Amino acid sequence: QTIQNFAASDAWAAQFTGLWPNNEKNQMADWLFSLENNTDGSPKGIGLSAWRFNIGAGSAAQGSESGIKDPWRRGEGFLQDDGSYDWRKQAGQQWFLQAAKERGVAQFIAFVNSPPIQMTRNNKAHSEDGLAANLSHDKYVDYGVFLANFLHHFKDSLAIDFDYISPFNEPQWEWKGGQEGSPWNNDELANATRV
């Protein structure tokens, strides 16, 4: 078996720690990504070779109305209610993404816990019933367009070229409100993939 990478995810702490003072977040980034050694020969960091970026669904803007009690399990969203994108969102996560690139991380993976709240069946970033995808039936194409727009923006504007995208994170789970998330059954996965 060949291991493709040694990775970690920015969910959920990076949205906050990426906004900390520069010396603190740079130290954290060194601990995560650095391949260098200190003068005594000890490693500066664990040298992750891949970094996973959580594309938030927008539950943070809903606050307690999101149905997600823990603010650390909510995410900002790039898609706005008027259909525009605010690429300034998820600033803490974007900082760690750039820090990973600057420190030589070789692979980047984007993943989605929930489609944007503007596209979900219940206007929330979690499932009500845990039985089916929390994506409106008429939003499958829009969801694909959203993901494509995300990838193009990060490549064209930030020079981050994601190697992989995971549009369905842990689809077998119910995701009924502990954090952003959506279940997907096999037919829904197939339909979304065909789009």
Which residues make up each language-model segment?
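N-terminal catalytic cores of secreted or lumenal carbohydrate-active enzymes
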Residues: 1-163, 167, 175-177, 182-190, ...
